[in-house]
Amino acid sequence: RAFFAPAAPRRRPEKHAKGSDTMELFRCPVCGAPLTRGARVLVCPKRHSFDLAAEGYAHLLPAAQMHAKIPGDSREMVAARRRFLDTGGYACFSDGLNALVCSLLMELPAPSLVDAGCGEGYYTARLVQALRASGKTPSAAAFDISKFAVKVAARRDKAHAVQWAVASSFAIPVADAAADCLVDIFSPAAAQEFARVVKPGGAFVFAVPGPRHLYGLKEVLYERPYENTVQDVAYPGFALEQRIPVHSMLTVTGSTILDLFAMTPYYWKTPRSGAERLASLDTLTTELHFDFLVYRRAHA
């Protein structure tokens, strides 16, 4: 009588996370070593491993750097900002950023770009698209402390043009002197880390609200509206080269008014009476005033 061994069970093919084919700009957040990409994981030579989500982003925020159970913007805040930005309400700002960075990187055919505090990726994606349209082949890494924001960014990046990660600006998982240009859009400036990451002679573009930004919104929210403080900060290792203002007017209607409100810091510090006045409006017109602060990294 012949005996046959049972057939080996079929193994399901290993699923690979979506996203950029390489993660060459990111480094291990524990030891700083290069990361090798597997199917659903990034691993460094010291065997520190980090999950790759199905959408293609990496989770490079160690537990020791998480100062809250769920750090960063909530799912609701991210959704409100995404809806508002999709209306084109801040397109003038995005277009200005694109023109500025393209001019700063004019002489580099393959520049490296880092977006610190990228949110849901609206500005990053449009900036990379503009660089490509100008004939460049950029390498771009973008990160935010909010996993909800990064998840949206990676999911919408159908071309896998950007390396996305959940990470902190105060412990950036990027190698020293890796970025030709670093952009920070309305996020806290981690000057020491930015100086480490930007190449000597490279650029740091810091986008901040100008004095009259969203003043029309404040006139509804507050009995005594106030102008924003002018930011003109000196950062060690950088020299401020220029301040470039962007002015426009914005009219929003319906639910977009509340989406705009929800993506601002005023959402957390407005009295109920002000929020109720805003909710009663059908139309809101307000000034937009952004400033781009362009810093140059000192040469070694």
Can you describe what each PLM-predicted range is?
Residues 191-203:
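A short glycine-rich, Lys/Arg-flanked "PGG" loop and its adjoining helix->strand segment in the class I
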Residues 67, 72-96:
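Class I SAM-dependent methyltransferase Rossmann-like catalytic core
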Residues 21-70:
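N-terminal auxiliary segments of SAM/dcSAM-dependent transferases
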Residues 170-181:
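A short acidic, Gly/Pro-enriched loop at the edge of an enzyme's catalytic core
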Residues 246-300:
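Conserved Class I S-adenosyl-L-methionine
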Residues 112-115, 120-171:
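Class I SAM-dependent methyltransferase SAM/SAH-binding core
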Residues 179-193, 208:
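A short SAM/SAH-binding and catalytic strip from SAM-dependent methyltransferases
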Residues 201-211:
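Conserved beta-strand signature within the Rossmann-like core of class I S-adenosyl-L-methionine
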